[in-house]
From Swiss-Prot:
GO terms for molecular function: monoatomic cation:bicarbonate symporter activity; zinc ion transmembrane transporter activity. It catalyses: Zn(2+)(in) = Zn(2+)(out). Residues 1-202, 391-398, 470-501, 585-594, 648-654 are extracellular. InterPro entries: ZIP (IPR003689), ZIP4_12_EF-hand (IPR049406), ZIP4_N (IPR041137), ZIP_Transporter (IPR050799). Its main location: membrane. This is Zinc transporter ZIP12. The keyword Transit peptide does not apply. Belongs to the ZIP transporter (TC 2.A.5) family.
Length: 654
């Protein structure tokens, strides 16, 4: 492929600009032809067409620029009619800024500069024509550097491919170019003699501008057409209903029923549903609108299909209102209505049933579900206190306690690792597959499950070493008090009354603060989502049963009667409701929710891995292998429960 030389680009571009006229539209080159190499030999044919349609002398710089500005400033529209042309920029000013002369023939450098100024004019036509921006009081270098720095986050010395796409998006709208397959940006750059991967610089940008203007006036589509024309939506609606240009009353009734019930979707073909494109129109310094657009994934060589594309609000505004930045008026909304109806009919933005976006719980749901959860938590803690009454043997009590300790370690650490930490880090966010399907990435759950497997593996090694090598070894200093405190008789000596009362007060105060924190955590969890509330409640409940069993044993050993101990334990459990409603009130902000859940994850890991797991390792019993089996059963049950909740929590319906 041979590339244009600098002189041929400028002159051919200019005469192609001037040669386009309404009467010669049938002579537009096809998209394929426009992508082929151009040669200066075409100049004769261009001059012949030009002289037949424009009687004005073209050897005068001012007349050439005026003709060029009229054809660029007043492009043909889709209806094929040229309206009144009110130029917002004087040809003389354009020529002076480009460094041209009124009498001499235009030089190739002036032609390229004029093309660059026209690109700036196209991008900022609304501001220029509303007198918000005056092009006459700036020098040429200002417009050159303005285009080079179109995107503030990219290199200001080069026009990147993204910036080139932004410019081409404007030109496609402005000139309403061909809807056929477009010339790729890279091909356009090569045709303009731009070989650097960085893009055009200040020396080659004017040459690229001349090529863009020339091809656009010929009707050649440049870049990638990422949005359909406005007429597409109306055509889709009529085609979906009866494939004609008119609607009968019965078909209009069918349309209304579809929109009312949302029970069926009118699809023209079976295509993968696309995720809603979050493409907003971002304004950078200098009032440049950078178009971020998306396209239905079709074959590169095939025609573009928009039938199942989900357009964002910004894209619909871009299609119907030409990137309008002001508020949408009633007339604007009338124009956009076909697009909105088409999106509803095609169900393009509808997710699969099992992947619907989670809606934040309502105030009634948060307070209702969380109150039920704390009530169950309170009853569960009381269950822990009643278990001890049915076991007069200390050995049986210790075995039951270790079963629940293992369950608590599994649920607490499992909730922290499999649910809370991923939620804090945003790993629960939905992603989109290659074909546009929604799914929640579960890869992190398997990695975290491997982490839990490592914890369990080393626990087994240490426990087996303790059982096989030193079965009669003394207990370690980490042994928990709850596991070793014998169940005393109810008749405790009165001489220890003062010490017993102090110990009971310490236990009750600590238990009240602990339950308050549990209520706070449950409130934050249910404020986040119902699923988070369920998993957190299960973890806390499994922890509360052995915890309350231990506290109750300490209260009995301190000399309190059984009935008083149960009553005091119940009163301390009620502080969870205080923490709950405080948590619900302060965790309305998602940021506060995340911080509460962050501290909760740390607390769960500390309780399970620092406080309770060492107890399971060093506790002594007369039946060590039975305790070993019960501990592992509790651990496995806790981790398995939280793992299944992490996998299937999206399917939980409350």
């Amino acid at each position: 492929m041979c590339f244009w030389t600098k002189p041929s680009v400028s002159w051919v571009s200019l005469f192609l600009l001037l040669s386009l006229d309404p009467s010669t539209e049938t002579e537009k080159p096809s998209t394929q032809d426009s992508s082929s190499t151009w040669s200066p030999g075409q100049l004769t044919e261009v001059l012949r067409v030009l002289s037949a349609d424009d009687p004005r002398p073209l050897n005068h710089s001012r007349s050439l620029i005026r003709t060029l500005l009229e054809k660029t400033g007043c492009p043909r529209r889709t209806d094929g009619r040229q309206g009144d042309c009110n130029l917002c920029f004087e040809p003389d000013a354009l020529l002076l800024i480009a460094g041209g002369d009124f009498e001499d023939q235009l030089k190739e450098e002036v032609i390229q500069r004029v093309s660059l100024l026209l690109l700036y004019y196209i991008i900022h036509q609304e501001e220029i024509c509303s007198s918000k921006l005056n092009m006459s009081n700036k020098e040429y270098t200002f417009y050159l550097h303005s285009l080079l720095s179109l995107r503030q986050d990219e290199d200001s010395y080069f026009l990147s491919q993204n910036e080139t796409e932004d410019i081409l998006a404007f030109t496609r709208q402005y000139f309403d170019t061909s809807r056929n397959q477009c010339m790729e940006t890279k091909v356009l750059q090569k045709k303009s003699g731009i070989l650097s991967s960085d893009g055009a610089d200040e020396n080659t940008l004017p040459q690229l501008a001349a090529t863009i203007i020339a091809l656009s006036l010929q009707g050649v589509c440049l870049g990638q057409r990422n949005l359909p024309p406005p007429d597409y939506f109306t055509e889709y609606i009529f085609s979906a209903l009866n494939s004609t240009n008119t609607l009968h009353l019965s078909e209009l009734d069918k349309l209304l029923n579809t929109l009312w019930t949302k029970s069926t979707c009118i699809r023209k073909d079976k295509i993968h549903q696309l995720r809603r494109k979050q493409n907003s129109l971002t304004l950078h310094d200098g009032d440049y609108s950078n178009l971020s657009v998306s396209m239905d994934p079709e074959s590169e060589d095939g025609p573009i299909s928009w039938d199942q594309t989900c357009f964002s609000a910004g894209q619909l505004v871009n299609i119907f209102l030409q990137n309008k930045l002001s508020p949408i008026s009633k007339e604007d909304f009338k124009q956009m209505s076909p697009g909105i109806i088409q999106q509803l009919l095609s169900c393009s933005c509808q997710l699969p049933q099992n992947q619907q976006a989670k809606i934040a719980p309502t105030t009634l749901e948060k307070y209702g579900y969380s109150t039920v959860a704390v009530t169950l938590l309170t009853l569960g803690s009381m269950l822990g206190t009643t278990l001890i009454l049915f076991h007069s043997c200390e050995e049986n009590y210790r075995l039951i306690l270790q079963l629940f300790v293992g369950l608590a370690v599994g649920t607490l650490s499992g909730d922290a690792l499999l649910h809370l930490i991923p939620q804090i880090l945003g790993l629960h966010m939905q992603e989109t597959s290659e074909f546009g399907h929604f799914y929640e990435n579960k890869g992190h759950i398997w990695k975290l499950l491997g982490l839990i497997g490592g914890i369990h593996g080393f626990f087994l090694i240490e426990k087996c070493f303790t059982l096989l090598v030193s079965p009669g070894a003394k207990k370690g200093p980490e042994d928990a008090q709850a596991a070793e405190i014998p169940i005393p008789s109810v008749n405790t000596p009165n001489r220890k009354c003062k010490t017993i009362s102090l110990l009971a007060i310490m236990i009750l105060v600590g238990d009240s603060l602990h339950n308050f924190a549990d209520g706070l955590v449950i409130g934050a969890a249910f404020s986040s989502s119902s699923e988070a509330g369920v998993t957190t409640t299960i973890a806390i409940l499994c922890h509360e049963i052995p915890h309350e069993m231990g506290d109750f044993a300490v209260l009995l050993s301190s000399g309190l009667p059984v009935k008083i101990a149960i009553l005091m334990n119940f009163i301390s459990a009620l502080t969870a409701f205080i923490g709950l409603y405080i948590g619900l009130s302060v965790s309305t902000d998602p940021c506060i929710q995340n911080w509460i859940l962050t501290v909760t994850a740390g607390m769960f890991l500390y309780l399970s891995l620092v406080e309770m797991l060492p107890e399971m390792t060093h506790v002594q019993t007369q039946r060590p292998w039975l305790m070993f089996l019960l501990q592992n059963f509790g651990l496995t049950l806790g981790w398995l429960s939280l793992f299944l909740l992490a996998i299937y929590e999206q399917n939980i319906k409350i």
